[in-house]
């Protein structure tokens, strides 16, 4: 499973899971993963590892996109979040460790993208400036 940065406004710091052709979210009350989206008509790479062609904040709005190929290998699809977000963070691509983790994930060692900074729930309550966004108290 590969974590994706969430795009729902209420879940800004919770990562979703990309596992094979499904994006899921962990339901703490039910203690189970719930599917959010599937990539119908698409094929992933590397057999049992089932990797997308690319995963990362490629459009520059801090949320991660997934690039996959169609099952007939005639096109690429870029999947983006349809959910609006009130957060306006600087793109994760400005962070060198994050850029390097995209390269590592997609051309070599299969590990999820990682930023070079802490991105946790406490930030929202901090009232501090974070990557160009001012949190309220």
Identify the residue ranges that each predicted region occupies.
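Hydrophobic beta-strand segments that make up the repeating blades of beta-propeller
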Residues: 15-20, 66-69
């Amino acid at each position: 499973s590969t974590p994706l940065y969430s795009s729902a406004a209420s879940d800004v710091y919770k990562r979703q899971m990309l596992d094979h052709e499904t994006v899921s979210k962990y339901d703490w009350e039910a203690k189970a993963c719930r599917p959010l989206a599937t990539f119908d008509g698409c094929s992933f790479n590397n057999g049992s590892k089932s990797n997308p062609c690319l995963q990362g904040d490629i459009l520059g709005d801090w949320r991660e996109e997934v690039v996959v190929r169609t099952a007939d290998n005639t096109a690429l699809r870029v999947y983006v979040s349809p959910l609006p977000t009130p957060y306006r963070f600087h793109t994760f691509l400005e962070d060198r460790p994050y850029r390097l983790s995209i390269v590592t994930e997609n051309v070599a060692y299969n590990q999820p993208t990682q930023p070079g900074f802490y991105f946790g729930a406490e930030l929202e309550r901090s009232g501090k400036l974070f990557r160009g966004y001012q949190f309220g108290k």
